[in-house]
Amino acid sequence: MMEIKPIGYVKNNAEEDVDFDELVSIIEILPDYVDGLYRIEECDELEIIFYFHKSSSYKLRVHPHHDPTQPEVGVFSSRSPNRPNFLGLTRVKLLKREGNVLFVKGLDAFNGTPVIDIKPVTRRDQRK
């Protein structure tokens, strides 16, 4: 069995119809993991892995953006939060760090979302 523990939580005032691209969120890192932030402010962009805590079920076929006028696609061809393992991944801009708190822009997660991992975006990730 696999055990995954949150390293922190998202704090924001996001509603269902928010423009996540412009939303500034706080990621509050738990005390046991703060040392893992060492030199993170040298990164411009981060990839945030999180748990869709508001999802409770999934389908293997979905309509993109929950729009029934769009043709169905497989869940792995979509950004749907209703996935078999309820994991999300978003690239964000790191605005600043204050102790155990990261200020990021563009995170498509709601208040209270558990953060599972953080990775820097590297040149390798930007290859076409």
How would you label these PLM feature ranges?
Residues 1-91, 95-128:
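Glycine-rich, low-complexity intrinsically disordered segments
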